[in-house]
């Protein structure tokens, strides 16, 4: 299971991560998306799966020296930042409500967590231009 935003879903729904992931052989959890760690992820699965994954990682050059400080940042994020994910959801909802006021926004998909997806009715506004203008206002946004 790609758990990049698993904890966002847990906060939003009240369903725990174990329940979400019980039908998967493995779960990957990212510490740098919503949790605020600079880097880091963890892969969980059966002992056999993890042992195989470890060997593949080593073959592909995935070893890191002195990764303890990064692990400490991930632990801090787990201990202190999960409860803050609901704030991200509130900010996303606020952004969606503000976007609804703009004539140039045609459709906003339902906002459930921290992802806001919308279309522009004014096709003369390029996605890269919108991204730049929103970043100037302090928003981190990507276009696809």
State where each predicted segment sits.
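Conserved PLP-enzyme active-site core in the AAT-like
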Residues: 1-143
